[in-house]
Structures are given as structure tokens and as C-alpha cells.
């Protein structure tokens, strides 16, 4: 009966990132450049996580169970990679000078990304999560990646090799990764007394650059109605 459909339990889960490295070639067509080997996934509970993975694994075998939604949220590596590269190349992007987003990586920007990543890892530690550094994650997700440093690995990942930089600074790599990635990471840090000065700097500068108040529009604990919870309550709510 139709009424039975509405009584069925719906399981909602999130992955740490998109399973594909891909780009739209034209409306309705996507070029899949690479496929990640492992992607963390979590539901609202361990039971829901196991249920979702069990039903998705015949079609998407690369999903790995995460401990909770805090882990999948903080393992959003794109939020560490994307804003840094776009921000430090904003003038080049505005001048419409094409360059490769990863292949043209430089040691200094890669070093900044690693410093930014340390803030993410410290926030994770405060919530009981041992997060994977970005340099290790590239090899974890893309085993064919070669290189010893983060810079070398970003330049020598076959899935990244031909990905061009965006054509505008109004790109999802800022307009999505700031409000849905760096904002909640920064806010979780504030909730447990972990300072995130580099994250906060990127958020502030990008908000001014694009004239978008990301703090007002982003996924803050206030906007998610989690601002009155302590650390243990946040962990319990997201586990």
C-alpha cells in the first residue's frame, strides 16, 4: 500500500568526498578522469553505516565505514586543497591564464596546505579522531600516485594530471568548500578550544574577495543548531 512506503525507514549517509575525479565536458556529459580506491562513508549510527555500505558495495565497492559523521566531515580533503590553490592563484585565474590545478603545484603552496592541514588534524584529535594527513590520503585514495612530498604527489597523481584550474574565482572550490568545509572545521575547533588561524584567514580573505559572508551563510554550529552542545554532546549527536 502507498501508506506503507511512508512508514519505511530511510537511511541517510555521507561520504567524505566524491568518489570520482571528474569534470563536465559539456552539459549532460562528464569526463571521469580517475576513481578513488577508498572513500569513507558514515550514517547516523554504526548500524546505519553498515546497512548503507552493505547495500551499496555491489555497485560501489570502495566505500569504507567511518567511525562517525565527524570523521567523514573532517576528512573532507577538498576543503584543504581547493581554497588554498584558488586563493594563491586568484590573479592568474582572473586574467584567464590557463594552468593545471595540481600539476602546476609549487613547493611553497604545498607547504602551506600541510600547515593548514595540521589545524584540521588538531581539531580531529580534540574529537577523538586520528585523521589522515593530506600527503598520505592522496596515496590512500589513489594508489598509483608517486612522489615523496605532498608537492610531488599532487603533481604526479594520474587522476589529477589533466585537471585545469577553474575559469573564474567564483568557483565551487571556494563557494562550496569554504561554507561546507572550512567553516564547520573552524567552528568545531572553536567549540573545543583549538585555534585555526590559517582556516580563519582563508575564510576572512575569501569572504572579502568574493563579497560573500561565508560565516553568515556557512554551516556554523549556530546554523546547524549545535552551538549549545558541548564536545561530548556533539560527538554523541554525530555518532
For each predicted feature, which ranges?
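Glycine-rich phosphate/pyrophosphate-binding beta-alpha loops
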Residues: 20, 107, 176
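Short, small-residue-biased leader/transition segments that mark boundaries at the very start
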Residues: 1-6
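Active-site-lining helix/loop region of Rossmann-like oxidoreductase modules
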Residues: 39-137
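Short, surface-exposed amphipathic charged segments that create phosphate/polyanion-binding patches used
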Residues: 25-34, 79-84
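A short acidic, often aromatic-flanked loop/helix-cap motif at beta-alpha or helix-coil junctions
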Residues: 18-23, 72-73
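Short, acidic/small-residue loops that bind anionic groups at enzyme active sites
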Residues: 8-18
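NAD(P)-dependent Rossmann-like dehydrogenase/reductase catalytic/cofactor-binding core
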Residues: 110-239
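A short alpha-helix capping/helix-coil boundary motif
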Residues: 30-33, 99-100, 161-166
Amino acid at each position: 500500500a502507498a501508506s506503507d512506503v511512508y512508514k519505511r525507514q530511510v537511511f541517510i549517509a555521507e561520504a567524505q568526498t566524491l568518489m570520482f575525479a571528474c569534470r563536465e565536458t559539456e552539459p549532460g556529459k562528464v569526463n571521469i578522469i580517475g576513481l578513488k580506491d577508498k572513500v569513507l562513508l558514515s550514517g547516523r549510527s554504526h548500524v546505519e553505516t553498515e546497512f548503507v555500505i552493505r547495500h551499496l558495495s555491489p555497485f560501489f565497492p570502495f566505500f569504507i565505514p567511518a567511525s562517525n559523521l565527524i570523521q567523514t566531515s573532517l576528512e573532507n580533503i577538498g576543503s584543504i586543497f581547493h581554497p588554498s590553490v584558488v586563493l594563491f592563484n586568484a590573479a592568474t585565474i582572473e586574467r584567464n591564464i590557463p594552468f593545471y590545478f595540481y600539476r602546476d603545484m609549487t613547493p611553497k603552496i604545498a607547504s602551506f596546505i600541510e600547515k593548514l592541514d595540521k589545524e584540521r588534524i588538531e581539531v580531529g584529535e580534540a574529537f577523538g579522531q586520528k585523521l589522515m594527513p593530506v600527503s598520505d590520503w592522496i596515496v590512500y585514495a589513489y594508489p598509483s600516485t608517486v612522489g615523496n612530498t605532498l608537492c610531488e604527489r599532487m603533481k604526479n597523481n594520474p587522476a589529477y594530471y589533466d585537471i585545469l584550474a577553474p575559469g573564474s574565482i567564483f568557483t565551487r572550490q571556494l563557494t562550496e568548500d569554504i561554507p561546507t568545509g572550512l567553516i564547520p572545521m573552524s567552528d568545531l575547533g572553536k567549540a573545543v578550544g583549538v585555534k585555526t588561524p590559517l582556516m580563519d584567514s582563508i575564510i576572512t580573505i575569501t569572504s572579502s574577495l568574493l563579497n560573500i559572508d561565508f560565516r553568515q551563510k556557512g554551516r556554523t554550529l549556530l546554523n546547524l543548531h549545535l552551538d549549545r552542545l558541548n564536545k561530548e554532546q556533539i560527538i554523541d549527536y554525530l555518532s
